Structures are given as C-alpha cells and as structure tokens.
Amino acid sequence: MDLKKTVNLLDTPFPMRGDLARREPGWLAQWQAQQRYQKLRKIAAGRPKFILHDGPPYANGDIHIGHAVNKILKDIIVRSKTQAGFDAPYVPGWDCHGLPIEHQIEKLVKGDKKAIEAAPSIHARITEYRKANGLDAKATDLPASFIRELCREYAGLQVERQKKDFIRLGVLGEWDNPYRTMSFRSEADEIRALGKLYQQGYLFKGLKPVYWCFDCGSALAEAEVEYQDKTSPTIDVAFASAEPEKLAAAFGLSALPAGKTASAVIWTTTPWTIPANQALNVHPDFDYGLYDTEKGLLILAADLAKGALERFGLTGVEVARCKGQALDRLTFRHPFYDRVSPVYVGDYVTLDAGTGIVHSAPAYGLEDFDSCRKNGMPNDAILNPVTSDGTYVDSLPFFGGLHIWKANPLIVEKLAEVGALMHTSPLSHSYPHCWRHKTPVVYRATTQWFVGMDREVAGSTLRQRALKGVDDTAFFPAWGQARLHAMIANRPDWCVSRQRNWGVPIPFFLDKQTGEPHPRTPELLEAVARKVEEQGINAWFELDPAELLGEDAARFDKMKDTLDVWFDSGTTHFHVLRGTHAEQLAYPADLYLEGSDQHRGWFHSSLLTGCALDGRAPYNQLLTHGFVVDGQGRKMSKSVGNVIAPQKINDSLGADILRLWVASTDYSGELAISDTILKGTTDSYRRLRNTIRFLLANLSDFNPATDALPVSELTELDRYALVLAQRLHAGVAEDCYPRYAFHTAMQAIVGYCTDDLGAFWLDIIKDRLYTTKADSKARRSAQTALWHVTRSLLSLLAPVLCFTADEAWQALTGEAEDSPVYHTWHELPVVADAEALAARWDVLRALRAQINKDIETLREAGAVGSSLQAEVDIEADAGLYPLLNALGDELKFVLIVSRVGVVPGPETRIRVSASGEQKCERCWHYHPTVGENAEAPTLCARCYDNIFGQGESRSYA
C-alpha cells in the first residue's frame, strides 16, 4: 500500500518563493488593465467618505526613500479605510511652480551638461527656438513667456517620472487624473482665493524684513529656510556717547569723571549690518554699569560685565549703575559714519551672551525693525544699503559695491582703525540657509505683500482663528499639536509675494501715485482668473492693461510679483478639494499626512489659508512621520554613501518588502533602514508567506459553499482558533488601523502567525488535516476554521502587503481578478461561548508550553526525537483535573504526544517519558495497536479506521 496516497498532503499554486521583484510589475499591469482604482470607486460609491488629501511633492527629480515612506503610509491608510467600509478616493498631486524648476531651465539655457542629460527634449526646444528666432546658439536672454512654457513642460516631465515610481510602490490612486498646481483651473482658483483674502482685509503691502536669498534674488517663506552650522565673526563695538551730560544724569552722576569718554558696547555676529545701524537696544529692567577701564568708560549689562571685560583684556571699576530704562532715548555716535543712534528699550534683549546691549539695523532684523517703527522711525528713514544680490549700493562710503560676506573682514578692520573694536573672535552657530542653494540667507527689508496675522477681521484675528484650528485638530503623534501651536503663536505676518517668473501672479494694478491697488480690484481679479483658466498664467504676464482698464491703464502699474509656492499648495483645499476634483473629493479633508517638517510647511500654510477663507482648518486630523536615517541613525547623504533608493529595493526585493518595512517601523520618530534591517524585514515576510502557503494548501480541496460546517459543530480547538482570529481582528482592524498604529498592527499579525498559528493551532491540527478522512467532519471542522482565519488574515494584511495578499486571495477564491480591497474586513462568525472557551484554552496553552519545555529536556538528553515519541502523565489539582479529563484521549493531540494519562491529585505534577511502543508509519504516533492488523502491520488502529473504516471523530482537538 502506498501510504502517501492515504494522507491528505495537498499543494497550492501559491509558491513558496515570492519572487516579488520580477512578478510585481506584471501584477501592476493587470491592475491597470482591470482598471482597479475605477472599479473600486464604483464598489465604494455611496459609502461614507474618508478623504486623505495628498500633500503635493515637488515636481523635480527622482523620488527618494522619504517619498516612498510617505506614499506607502498614505496607501495603507486609504486601503484600510476602504476595507473598513469607507469610500476613500485618493487623488495624488504635484507642486509645480517655483524656483527649483526655474533653476533647472536656467541650467538648460546655459548648456549645463547634467541638466541636458536629464531633460534632452527641453534642450531641443531651446535649440529650435534660438534657430527659429535667429538667435546665437548660446543666447541666454530668452523671453520670460518662453521660459515659463519651458518650466511648464519640464514640470510635466517630472510629474510623469515620479508618477511611474509611485505606481511601482503599489499605490492605488487617480493616476490618470492627478492634480497639478500648474493646471490652468488651479492657477485661476488660486487667484480667486487671493481675491477673497484681499476682500476680507487680510492682505496688505508693507516694508518689512523678510528672509532673503541672494542666490534666489527673492524673499523666502519660513518653510524654505533650514538651519545649518556657520562660522561668523563676533565683534564687540564701542559707540561713543553723543550726550555726556545726559548720560551722567542717567547714572545719577553730576558729571562723568574728568577727561573720560563714555561708550556703549554692543556685541553682534553680523558685522555687515554695522553700516546700517540706526539704534541701540537695552532691556528696561536690567542693571547696566558704567565701568572705568583703560579704554575709557564702558557701559555694559552688570550681569555680563565681568565676562565682557575679560574678553576685552581690560580691568574695570564700576563707577555707577542704573536701570536700562534710564538710558532710553540717549544718543551714541556711529563708529565710522557721521550720525547718531538713539537707545530704545526692548523686552527682547537678553543676557544669554554679549554685553546686554543690542545694535539695531532695522532693515535687517525683525525685532530691530519693530523697535524702530514703534519708536517713531518712518519707513523712508530706514537705511537699506544691501541690494537684492547681496552687494552694498555703490554710494555707501567705504564698502560700496562689495558683497556683504566679503565686506565682513573689511568692516572689522575699519572698526579697529577708528578705535571702536573692543574684541573679535569666530563663532560657530546655527544659522538660516536657503533650502535650495544651501547658502546663508539674511533678513532684508523690502516692500512685499503680506497676509496679516493680527488684523482683526469679523471679530477675530487670523492668529486667533489658526490657534483654534490647531486646538480643534487631532494629531498623530499627539506632540505635533504643541509644536504647531507654538509656531502659529510666534510667527510673523506671512510674506506671500515673490520676485520670480514661474509662479502664479499677484495680478494687481497699482496706482502709480499712491501704490494702492485699483479700486475695482476684486472685479479685476475675477476677470484675470477667467483668462488664466483658459490660457494659464502667461495670460496675465502678456496682458495689455488697457484691455481691462481702458483709459485708466496709464495711471496704473501691472504687478510682476508671483505668489509664494506655499500659497499654491496651501490653497489646495480650495482649488482641488473644492475645485478641480470636487466630484471625487470632499471638504474638509479627514486627514493630511506628511513629514514632520511640514508643521512649518504645508500643514502651516494650509491652516492659515483655511482659517482665513473658511474660519477653520481644512483638515480634521494631522499625521506626521519622521525622516529616514541609516542603520546608525545618520541622515541619508550621497557624500556619506548611505543612500538607499526605493527603486533599488523594488528591483531587488520587491515593493511588498519596502511596504512591510514601512508598516513595521514606528514612523513617529526617525525610520532606520539598511541592508541588515531589510534582511530582517525579508525574514519576517518569508515567515508570513510560509504561513499563508500552509493555509492555502490545506484549503485547496475545500469549497466553503458545500463543505463548511456551522460554528456549533466545530471542535473546541477550532472554535478557539476563531476566537484568536477575532482577537487579532479587534486589535488590528478596530484599533491599530483606525489610529494609524501600523507597526503595532504588524507586531500583532506577525506574533499571531508565529505563536497562535504556527506554534499552536496549525501545529496541532496537522494530524487531523493529514490523517483523517478527506471529507470527515473532523477535517472539515479544521478547514472551516482555516477558511475564516485565512480570509481574515489576508484581509488584515492587504493594506500593507498589497501584492502578496492579492496573489493569495486569488489562490483562495479561484477568481483571477478578485482582491481583498474590493471587500470589507472579513466578518468572522460569532462563537457563542467565546469567553469561557478562551479561558479554558488559554490554560491548556500554558500547560502545553510547560510540557514542551520538559520534552525539550528529554530531547537534549537524547531520550526522544520528536514530541510524538514522548508520553505524559499528569497528576492534576482540583482546578485543572476536570478540564483535562473532559478532553479524554484527545488531550494527546493538543500536546502532540503519543499518550497522556491524567489522574487527580492535591497539586499538579507532570512527568514526561519516552514511549516504549511502536511507531505508526502513517501518523507517526507511538501506540500499542501498531501491528495488530495483519493487513496493515505498520499502522495503528486509528489510521486503519481512517483508511478502511468509518474514520475517527473529534470533539475537542
């Protein structure tokens, strides 16, 4: 007899090896052919909506691992919400305007080789244009309108390039119709949003210091500034008193000591601002001392005087002391220009470093500007000698025409020459840099357009509305709320104007006399918006003002400024959710999800525009994830050589491995990735796949429509397996997924597969699956539970392992185009006595774990090989005996041993020994009935009955 044919050893088309990198592209092609996203929209139509609004990545360059993390997290949420019973459309988007694209076009125009290799079609257009217009082959002075056309084309190419990589990750979405901030409709609606802000009174023009990048030649948003270490020259500079008598009186003296000059000493890290000094600041409540030194009388904050004098190499005796308030309005002479600087008191002066006296250049510092304006300095009196490219105006004495960074050492020399330099030394400190050019930026006063944070509109300010918006938003993780709250509470007015070409215009006509917008501005903005909606932003830049203004055109200038790109993305709730994609989406969004840097970026700008336009945040929830670092916690860097590209992972391991890594990592902090970490992820995947393969193989001859048993007819163990599956479902589908705790979900799923399934239930039921009659109730009981467990497990895994879950689902259902994402979470059958059942079997599992340890001791001693070679005798106490006795002979199947004896006793004792019986060739149990039947001398009686007789029945295991 061929015993192998009597055992139910089944196979499955679901292979052991995933071979994901090779097979995933084929599955993606099938999804596209099946129009999976569109089909899903039809299936989910009419359900409650869940809107995850995509924060647009910038359309420039290949996606990196951070992009992959972001898109995968979004996809997991969209899929899990869909399976939870929501209509969760996902419309991806791109941020398309702005300086990086302009710079790429500038490089192409100048013939940069790398830029040409990256965008040969754009280079070809430039070449054709030069030929067609009779220009020199290297001509760089091309019309702005043509440059904008090239920017639009370049952005379109980048969108397609990134889209391909995002789709490769398995992300389901409206890829055929994404939103792009450069679509004509979006550009027009941005102008309409601007018009609403203008009408409400939030928008104003003003002179203010704003972040300025000399390389960009433009103002920057706070989100476009990053901090890096920079070494600056620190200087202590003496400003001589212009009013000695008043100074003496301030210190309570009748006169200054005879023959002594007095100076206030300031400390700064920006020597280049000294030519623009217009005031000194002291704190009204600090003590200031007048110190007699070898270099005359010096005014210093009393708490900093000792350190300052040591720094200067001087000794000093305190002559007098006064509060800072007493020095208010006294004047001091500029070190090398013939003018005086008044003292203004200010609460922002600190004793953290320096001298306690701050030099004030109102054109180059926010606090300096506010202090001087508060004390009556008019805008036209503010000195602003630094031009947009970082050079001083030619008319500035001593330093005209020099770049400020080159002028720094020369200014220090000049101060030394005139005897005003008390000390200088280098200081390494954190300093703002342009995020694009990585070069230092400055504050520079320019006339710009601002959204006012503290202008009262309809009874409240934008700051108040935004702070309430933060309070009304749920944050994941929770610490994000305090962070965004602090940013809003302390931020200045929002500078929304930029001096660039490739951006949505601020289409104002300004009166040549007053500089004020045309009285019909709201009406004109709508007229411009309609033109832009038809022709794009070039419609404004090429517009003849007379077309809209008629004879008035001569009295007005057409603005050339463009909007901050953060206004582009910050108004997507207006021009996407309620604009280009209003039919698919809804407002407000349920969730915005981006990296933690977006508290000062997209979350921030969206909050401000939402609260200005609608009085509320445009989102109900905010989720932030950390940045990706290497295995040692270092930032990804080409120079360090630790960059791991998502494309490489997809091509070598498969996107499901990348998705599993993302889902298994706590994204609330930094996400570490390395080859070693990915190997661990691959091992976890392999264990999951092997579990799925076992489940599918043992269901390959099971038809749930004809073979499934009612829950009440299942064995106790199989009902317990359903309880365990229900526990997992409750933890994952009803808790982890709704609160976006994916790493906790994956820990639970992997733990379930390892402990509840592999090490327990599946281990026990193998005997029943393999050795009982194929259509026996005992086997069908196991298969009924297996079917529910498999559907539930695949359903829970599907948001993460979208490719693998699909492959397994189709193997389970036999339907080539089916997918878990088309179905809501699998509804597990109710187990009537679940609580009591679970309590009993939890006790049995604990007992089994103890007995396994004892068997392992025997195995290590060489007494037994497998656990089936062991016999167990249990003396059970009064609490345990009824439970074990009820199982009778089936207890041996639970313990996977050949015999179990149970007797009552005062306390529980366990004895494990090697069996002395013969081994059944078919079931591998050691049993005294082996050899009893001459027809099958190698079989036990149980196996003989399962082959030739009625077959065994099971109630418990």
From Swiss-Prot:
EC top class named in words: ligase
Residues binding Zn(2+), per UniProt: C920, C923, C940, C943
Cellular component, GO annotation: cytosol
Keywords in alphabetical order: Aminoacyl-tRNA synthetase, ATP-binding, Cytoplasm, Ligase, Metal-binding, Nucleotide-binding, Protein biosynthesis, Zinc
EC number in record: 6.1.1.5
GO terms of biological process kind: isoleucyl-tRNA aminoacylation
Subcellular localization: Cytoplasm
Full protein name: Isoleucine--tRNA ligase
Native species: Laribacter hongkongensis (strain HLHK9)
